[in-house]
Design a protein with these regions (language model features):
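Tryptophan-centric aromatic hotspots in well-structured domains and transmembrane helices
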Residues: 22, 59, 75, 88, ...
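N-terminal glycine-/serine-/threonine-rich beta1-alpha1-beta2 phosphate-ribose binding loop
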Residues: 1-76, 85-101
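Alpha-helix capping and helix-loop boundary segments enriched in small/acidic/polar residues
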Residues: 55-58, 81-85, 111-114, 184, ...
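Glycine- and other small-residue-rich loops at beta-strand/loop junctions that grip anionic moieties
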Residues: 53, 79, 105, 201, ...
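Residues embedded in well-ordered beta-strands within globular domains across many folds
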Residues: 13-15, 52, 136-139, 173
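A contiguous active-site-proximal alpha/beta segment in oxidoreductase catalytic domains
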Residues: 73, 81-166
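Glycine-rich, aromatic-lined ligand/substrate-binding cores of catalytic
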Residues: 160-208
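Short acidic (Asp/Glu) and glycine-rich catalytic loops that position anionic groups and cofactors
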Residues: 4, 150, 188-191
Length: 208
């Protein structure tokens, strides 16, 4: 949504392995845009200059490296990768292919500060003025208001269920170990499972 509203960018393509999500992405833009099921097709699109990777983190490293190989710059959601090794490979790829990589920690720039109701711009101005001195230590302790049990707590046992027709579950899993489908593994609640993310700290800690 942010890319649609920002005058400095033009959204030319969307990609998702969930047909319903893909359709929602297409509807965000008034003009006709390309829609892809496979990210490898999107990064070969000559109309694409920058890719915004907003998948679960277990895909971040692979997609970033492949996008760099295809000559695209990358805007990637946090965390950069699930592991340090994956992160190092991404850094190597950026140097090897001469591409730019930007980690999206947009809570630092959003106004008001997401979840806290605190304006960002006055705080940024205060820090930049030097009035607080340097080095500066900031301790974040207030909960953001997210339902942490819903978003960040996995379950020990999940009853296997049928994969919905709109979701390519095998592609969604990608490099992760195979586990039978359950809706709690995908979309909003995937963060509670180490195969895909690292819970609340890995999800939210990097914003601050």
């Amino acid at each position: 949504r942010g890319h649609v509203d920002y005058a400095g960018t033009r959204l030319v393509a969307v990609c998702d392995v969930d047909k319903n999500h893909l359709e929602l992405g297409k509807q965000l833009v008034k003009d006709k845009i390309a829609a892809y099921h496979d990210f490898r097709d999107l990064i070969l699109d000559p109309n694409v200059d920058i890719v915004h990777i907003a998948t679960p983190p277990h895909w971040h490293g692979i997609m970033s490296v492949e996008a760099a190989k295809a000559g695209k710059d990358i805007w990637c959601e946090k965390p950069m990768t699930r592991t340090i090794g994956e992160g190092k490979r991404v850094m190597e790829a950026m140097k090897q292919y001469g591409r730019m990589f930007r980690l999206n920690t947009w809570f630092r720039f959003a106004d008001p500060f997401y979840g806290l109701g605190t304006p960002v711009k006055p705080l940024k101005k205060l820090v930049q003025s030097g009035m607080l001195g340097w080095p500066l230590k900031v301790t974040i302790s207030k909960h953001t208001g997210f339902d942490w049990k819903f978003y960040w707590v996995g379950k020990e046992y999940l009853e296997p269920q049928s994969v919905p027709s709109e979701l390519d579950y095998d592609f969604w899993l990608g490099p992760a170990p195979y586990k039978p489908y359950n809706p709690h593994r995908v979309h909003q609640t995937f963060r509670g499972y180490w195969d895909y993310d690292g819970g609340g700290l890995e999800d939210m800690g990097q914003h601050y």
